[in-house]
């Protein structure tokens, strides 16, 4: 058995024996060490992209079924949206509380994995090696420092470790309470992430592989005869959830998976990302806007393939039923390839498979599979035994400990490199800090803003209106206003978050006139533009001079404004939408003596920063 064969020459207990006596304490120490590392990574992280959309939704929508059950990028996550709603109401844009939630979930997953490994393999020091791998691999890193990913992925990790623990307890003793516990943990995961549905496949593989016997038909008959209640319960829950997901969450066609070749996705997912992570890689990253893709060297890939294949072959040569141990990981990898082919890869291509957040469960399933490949599963009728007459060349405690430490240190290097890129390339914190600073620096508040979207480097425009100022900056509502008409003062933020006066580039102008241009007289005045206008998002800048103040009605296509013309020289800004080629002004005072000098229509842009 790995880590448990060699005894010390010195008097007293051997190192494996001492570790066995203090296994829980050592495991807890490893979990705390990982949490400290993740806390460091989170301390330099902040809200990014989908986090902003999540807060925008929570700040502007009521807490009802429409809010909770809305599909977000194909995700059905009412539990996640409920957590987001509570955090937003209590601590919008206060990162420390959101980071604390990620840490708590990571702690639960770590403790749950320790508990699961002890339940599966007993008090063997090899459990510590397995736990170290789970805690140090980069698979769960992006989910651990990016809230939008973590609120999906970490509940899946929790559901996996606690759900499988309960499922194994049911298989051993057939107690209904264990079955209920398994269903509750799985349902918990489903509230956050539809991919939790794959746990039913994992439960099935464990049941058929280790708690039945004979050929496949005999195994299936045995499962039905002995675990019928679980089969019916799991099928019912999975069927009901699948129907709910198809109704509320599915926003892509599974049939489109045939449009994207599977082989490049599988190569990126398994050959580049997964295999190199299992030896502590990938060591090298391809930076994106903020996140990073695995970008291992060819040497790293060759070493990882040799190491992974070598472990699998060695397990096969020294153990009696090691091959089935890899079925759990193989099942989820196959599902991941199919899911990426039907959704994400159709949009961004097969390189998306080099993003570890699409296979976070691989960390847990690899260490579980590694344990099953070498150790007997406690309480299972199918026992993984040593092959007679085969030497255990590579199972000394020193070798296992050295390999574990080497992988953990390598993973720490890969993790640090990823975190450095993540922390250095996220522009969100600086942008929103500058927004708040420049708004608070304005003496005349609330500041009138054009309600456009924040830069697409922070949140894509397809999330409109979630990306608009009025939604994302709802927490600053006391400092802002969003008029559809304003005199002289109208602002936007530039790409750095600095407050700037609006500039209206000339897409359309009034037809040229000498002198006054257009004098408001009679009951109404039409100002023709030099071309037709169609669509929305337009603003008009109307420069005028008036001897006295007057009310006025401005019709700009479908937008009608009842506003004021102040005395003196001013610029009036009004929004415009629809199909039109003439600006109509009416309902002004007959003695106002207003002269319109120029009219400019365009899509508003940031000007120079306000001083």
Role assignments for model-derived ranges:
Residues 320-347, 406-407:
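Transmembrane alpha-helix segments characteristic
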Residues 169-187:
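Short hydrophobic alpha-helices at membrane interfaces in multi-pass membrane enzymes
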Residues 2-70, 74, 79, 92-98, ...:
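Intrinsically disordered, polar/acidic, low-complexity terminal segments
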Residues 86, 110, 182, 186-202:
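Conserved beta-strand->loop/alpha-helix structural units within folded catalytic cores of enzymes
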Residues 115, 162-169, 203-211, 230, ...:
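Transmembrane alpha-helices and membrane-interface helical segments
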């Amino acid at each position: 058995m790995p880590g448990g064969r060699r005894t010390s020459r010195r008097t007293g207990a051997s190192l494996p024996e001492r570790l066995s006596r203090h296994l829980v304490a050592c495991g807890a120490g490893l979990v705390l060490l990982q949490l400290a590392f993740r806390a460091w990574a989170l301390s330099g992280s902040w809200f990014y992209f989908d986090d902003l959309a999540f807060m925008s939704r929570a700040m502007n929508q009521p807490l009802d079924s429409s809010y909770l059950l809305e599909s977000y990028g194909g995700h059905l996550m009412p539990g996640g949206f409920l957590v987001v709603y509570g955090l937003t109401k209590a601590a919008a844009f206060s990162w420390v509380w959101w980071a604390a939630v990620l840490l708590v979930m990571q702690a639960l997953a770590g403790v749950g994995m320790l508990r699961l490994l002890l339940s599966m393999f007993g008090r063997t020091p090899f459990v510590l090696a397995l736990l170290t791998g789970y805690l140090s691999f980069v698979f769960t890193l992006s989910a651990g420092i990016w809230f939008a990913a973590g609120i999906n992925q970490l509940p899946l990790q929790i559901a996996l470790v606690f759900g499988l623990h309960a499922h194994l307890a049911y298989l051993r003793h057939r107690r209904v309470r264990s079955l209920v516990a398994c269903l509750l943990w799985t349902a918990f995961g489903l509230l956050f992430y539809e991919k939790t549905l794959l746990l039913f496949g994992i439960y099935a593989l464990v049941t058929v592989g280790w708690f039945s016997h004979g050929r496949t038909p005999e195994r299936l008959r045995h499962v039905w005869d002995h675990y019928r209640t679980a089969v019916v319960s799991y099928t019912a829950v999975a069927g009901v959830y699948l129907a709910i997901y198809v109704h509320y969450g599915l926003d892509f066609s599974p049939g489109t998976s045939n449009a994207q070749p599977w082989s490049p996705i599988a190569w990126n997912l398994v050959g580049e990302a997964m295999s190199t992570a299992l030896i502590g890689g990938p060591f090298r990253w391809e930076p994106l806007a903020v996140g990073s893709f695995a970008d291992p060297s060819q040497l790293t890939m060759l070493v990882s393939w040799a190491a992974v294949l070598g472990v699998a072959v060695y397990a096969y040569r020294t153990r009696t039923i090691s091959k089935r141990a890899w079925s759990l990981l193989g099942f989820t990898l196959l599902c991941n390839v199919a899911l990426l082919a039907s959704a994400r890869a159709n949009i961004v291509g097969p390189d998306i498979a080099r993003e570890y957040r699409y296979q976070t469960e691989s960390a847990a399933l690899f260490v579980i599979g590694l344990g099953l490949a070498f150790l007997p599963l406690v309480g299972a009728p199918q026992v993984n035994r040593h092959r007679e007459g085969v030497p255990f060349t590579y199972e000394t405690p020193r070798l296992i400990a050295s390999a574990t430490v080497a992988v953990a240190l390598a993973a720490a290097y890969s993790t640090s490199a990823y975190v450095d890129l993540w922390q250095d390339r996220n522009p969100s914190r600086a942008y929103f800090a500058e927004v708040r600073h420049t708004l608070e620096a304005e003496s005349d508040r609330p500041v009138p803003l054009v309600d456009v979207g924040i830069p697409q480097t922070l949140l894509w425009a397809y999330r409109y209106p979630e990306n608009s100022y009025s939604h994302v900056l709802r927490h600053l509502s006391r400092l802002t206003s969003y008029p559809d008409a304003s005199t002289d003062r109208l602002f936007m933020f530039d790409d750095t978050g600095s407050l700037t006066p609006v500039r209206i580039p000339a897409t359309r102008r009034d037809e040229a006139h000498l002198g006054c241009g257009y004098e408001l007289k009679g009951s109404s005045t039409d100002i023709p533009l030099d071309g037709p206008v169609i669509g929305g998002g337009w603003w008009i800048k109307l420069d005028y001079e008036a001897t006295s103040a007057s009310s006025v009605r401005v019709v700009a296509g479908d937008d009608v404004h009842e506003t004021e013309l102040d005395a003196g020289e001013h610029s009036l800004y009004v929004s415009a939408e629809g199909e039109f080629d003439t600006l109509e002004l009416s309902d002004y005072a007959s003695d106002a003596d207003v002269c319109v000098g120029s009219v400019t229509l365009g899509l508003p842009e940031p000007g120079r920063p306000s001083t």
